[in-house]
Amino acid sequence: MAQQLSESDSGWWVVSDRGRIWLPEGELPYGSAAQWHLVGKMAYRIGEWQGMPVWLLCLTYPQDMASVRQLIDADRGLFQLAGRGVQLAEFFQSHRFCGYCGHPMHAGQQEWVRLCAHCQQRYYPQIAPCIIVAIRRDDHILLARHNRHRNGIYTVLAGFVEVGETLEQAAAREIFEESRLQVKNLRYVTSQPWPFPHSLMMAFLADYAAGDLCHDPKELQEADWYRYDRLPQLPPVGTVARRLIEDTVALCRVQHE
């Protein structure tokens, strides 16, 4: 699926290595391969944005390598494609050799897969399913500040789905582990690929059912109920967490204004 770039190739350029992405001047490069000195390099076409190809190159530069988080305020579709590129680059890097027999792997031609010619094993990009849930209690929403967040943002509860769990079971378990609360009326809202490092966020709304709030200090710095019109600092627009909070606020406005 990789091809050697020519002077006539152009589009958006996702240049990634070890979870970092090349962002000259803080933006995803756009233009011709010649303009960005990419002629002759091998690239994968991973999608299309605004009628132009999006290319992935698995290499690094000495400067301007950054986190794909810097693109979170860009258009959602472009951020998603950049995240795809970062995840694929990491997949190619971490699957150069077969985990069963140790022989070199090669890329498939029809799909994103790494193949072992020696033992015929096939490896696909890892995707970690996660649940993220906004919990409403009358005109309040549960928000928490996570230990991993250093910028004072308050958000909703989330966690990884474990082996053998349904999404509903994962939501109930994560909520109880982090807050000691039980919920009801769980309903699916939307999903969002989240390349940190390779998650798929599945978003839900829920209503409080029972329990006294007691946050897990290993996961959360604090957690509390916030009235819908008196909220702390929130996640940025474009994140699925922000979408859930805004949906919950809208429900509160309908019922309490």
From Swiss-Prot:
GO terms for cellular component: cytosol. A motif (Nudix box) lies at residues 159-180. Residues 125-248 form the Nudix hydrolase domain. One of its GO terms (biological process) is NAD catabolic process. A divalent metal cation 3 binds at residues 174, 178, 219. Keywords: Hydrolase, Magnesium, Manganese, Metal-binding, NAD, Zinc. Its EC number is 3.6.1.-, 3.6.1.22. A divalent metal cation 1 binds at residues 158, 178, 219. It catalyses: a 5'-end NAD(+)-phospho-ribonucleoside in mRNA + H2O = a 5'-end phospho-adenosine-phospho-ribonucleoside in mRNA + beta-nicotinamide D-ribonucleotide + 2 H(+); NAD(+) + H2O = beta-nicotinamide D-ribonucleotide + AMP + 2 H(+); NADH + H2O = reduced beta-nicotinamide D-ribonucleotide + AMP + 2 H(+). Its cofactor is Mg(2+); Mn(2+); Zn(2+). GO terms for molecular function: magnesium ion binding; manganese ion binding; NAD+ diphosphatase activity; NADH pyrophosphatase activity; RNA NAD-cap (NMN-forming) hydrolase activity; zinc ion binding. Substrate binds at residues 69, 111, 124, 192-199, 241. Zn(2+) binds at residues 98, 101, 116, 119. The keyword Cytoplasm does not apply. It comes from the Bacteria. A divalent metal cation 2 binds at residue 174. Divalent metal cations. Mg(2+) or Mn(2+). Binds 1 zinc ion per subunit. mRNA decapping enzyme that specifically removes the nicotinamide adenine dinucleotide (NAD) cap from a subset of mRNAs by hydrolyzing the diphosphate linkage to produce nicotinamide mononucleotide (NMN) and 5' monophosphate mRNA. The NAD-cap is present at the 5'-end of some mRNAs and stabilizes RNA against 5'-processing. Has preference for mRNAs with a 5'-end purine. Catalyzes the hydrolysis of a broad range of dinucleotide pyrophosphates. Homodimer. Belongs to the Nudix hydrolase family. NudC subfamily. This is NAD-capped RNA hydrolase NudC. It comes from Edwardsiella ictaluri (strain 93-146). The gene is nudC.
